[in-house]
Swiss-Prot record:
Gene3D superfamilies cross-referenced by the UniProt entry: Transcription elongation factor, GreA/GreB, C-terminal domain, Trigger factor ribosome-binding domain, Trigger factor, C-terminal domain
Occurrences of domain PPIase FKBP-type (ranges): 158-233
EC code(s) of this entry: 5.2.1.8
Record bears the keyword Hydrolase: no
Protein name: Trigger factor
Subcellular localization: Cytoplasm
Job of this protein: Involved in protein export. Acts as a chaperone by maintaining the newly synthesized protein in an open conformation. Functions as a peptidyl-prolyl cis-trans isomerase.
GO molecular function: DNA binding; peptidyl-prolyl cis-trans isomerase activity
Top-rank EC class of the record's enzyme: isomerase
């Protein structure tokens, strides 16, 4: 077998393997031995069929079987090669007395890691967030403590209504005399809400509606069983004492809520900054990666989408197979860059994940898994795939936190978009301008 590198493109080597007549004959004999051992050829005792008869019996398939046997020899030759993805046999054929295989060897792409210090991140101003938190919590407490009493007049924004409804589809009842309590709020534009505003106890409302992406028509019949007026308490010391026994004044309640909000804000801020780092990771590396490697990942993703019956919905959203292919490719390249950035930064900063950290995470996950901490630890010890996922998650978080520590963090007003949102808006504006120019 001769091996010859005929072309190199970024991380991919195109290698030609050539087998001579003796090697082809050896592969043919191997196939003959296999067939005689596992099959019975009509007219011959098992194991006694001659080569020419087996060739005739299998026809063109015999040649394919020989090529498969030679493919296995190539796989054996490459088993110790360090490859990014499995070797891809792009072409194989027998020409005369030689067999030629064209094989793509995908090496790990070369990586250029950029400077990850001083990354620009942003968070909303703490005082604004806390002020909004306190205001929202106070309003929430007012709603929870609202005084509710029957009302004779029509239902209005802020009222509570008790309804009984029946739904028909194609003349068949699919919901019969169901009851529901609804708080009427200004932004709720559901027909079941908008159609009862202004109605009184005992009124009956009927209407038809359809739902998005469906041609089915549903007929609703609603009876107003009761209208309840909600009266919200004034924000004063009496209100504060009624909703929190440990405080005596409204200011004390606000202070308590602010402390709660600060704790929640610090936890949220940590995750918020980590997510910003995650979104920027792809910008921190340059990958010298071939289109052939990306095509491999895209085709595999498409195959998985078809198996999971999600391909058609993806295709509908994309609009065409070409656009969907490019969307897959962009997403895959982005993820490859992010994962590579995590890996290279962890190597450079000598970030390690200890067994203690893995077991601690297993304990924390036990609640979500619905099992004991001891059982969770045992699973992590015996399931290498789960352990690897945990290790990768811990490593990713450590890298994110390190980048945050080295970042430049800017406080912005709560209504000011963060950097990623600005970039998206700029892209949308550019896209709109391009569309207008085309028109």
């Amino acid at each position: 077998m001769e091996k010859n590198v005929v072309k190199a493109e970024k991380n991919v080597e195109i290698v030609e393997f050539t087998f001579g007549p003796d090697e082809i004959a050896e592969a043919e004999n191997e196939i003959v031995r296999y067939v005689n051992k596992n099959y019975t050829i009509p007219g011959f005792r098992k194991g006694k069929a001659p080569k020419r008869i087996i060739e005739t019996f299998f026809g063109e398939n015999f040649r394919d079987m020989v090529l498969e046997e030679l493919s296995r020899k190539i796989e054996d030759t490459l088993k110790d090669e360090e490859l990014f993805i499995p070797a891809v046999i792009a072409d194989r054929k027998i020409e005369g007395d030689v067999a030629v295989f064209v094989v793509e060897l995908h090496r790990e792409p070369k990586v250029e890691l950029k400077d990850y210090t001083g990354l620009e991140l942003s968070v909303p101003k703490q005082e604004e967030v806390l002020a909004n938190y306190v205001d929202n919590k106070l309003e929430e407490l007012r709603n929870e403590a609202a005084i509710v009493e029957p009302k004779d007049g029509p239902a209005e924004i802020g009222d509570v209504i008790n309804i009984e409804y029946t739904i028909e589809k194609d003349g068949k009842i699919i919901a019969d005399h169901k009851t529901q309590e609804i708080l009427i709020v200004e932004d709720d534009d559901r027909p079941i809400v908008t159609n009862v505003i202004g109605k009184k106890k005992g009124d009956i409302v009927e209407f038809d509606r359809t739902f998005e992406n469906s041609n089915n028509k549903y007929h609703y019949k609603i009876e107003i069983k009761e209208v309840l007026k909600r009266t919200l308490m004034e924000l004063n010391d009496e209100f504060a004492k009624s909703v929190a026994s440990e405080v005596n004044t409204l200011e004390e309640l606000k202070k308590k809520l602010e402390e709660e909000g600060l704790e929640a804000f610090e936890s949220w801020k940590k995750d918020f900054l980590r997510q910003q780092v995650q979104d920027k990771l792809a910008e921190l590396v340059e990958l010298e990666i071939s289109e052939k490697t990306l095509d491999y990942f895209v085709n595999r993703a498409i195959e998985n989408a078809k198996k999971e019956n999600t391909y058609d919905s993806y295709l509908k959203q994309a609009g065409s197979e070409e656009k969907l292919y490019e969307e897959f490719k962009t997403g895959i390249l982005n993820e490859l860059k992010k994962n590579t950035a995590i890996e290279k930064i962890a190597e450079k900063e000598q970030i390690e994940v200890t067994d203690e950290e893995v077991m601690k995470t297993a304990e924390e996950l036990s609640t979500y898994w619905g099992i004991s901490p001891e059982r969770a630890k045992e699973i992590v010890k015996t399931r290498e795939d789960i352990r690897n996922d945990i290790v990768e998650n811990i490593r990713r978080t450590k890298v994110q936190d390190l980048i945050v520590e080295k970042a430049t963090i800017k406080e912005i007003s709560a209504d000011e978009p963060v950097e990623e949102q600005k970039e998206e808006e700029e892209k949308e504006e550019a896209g709109s301008e391009n569309s207008e120019n085309k028109e």
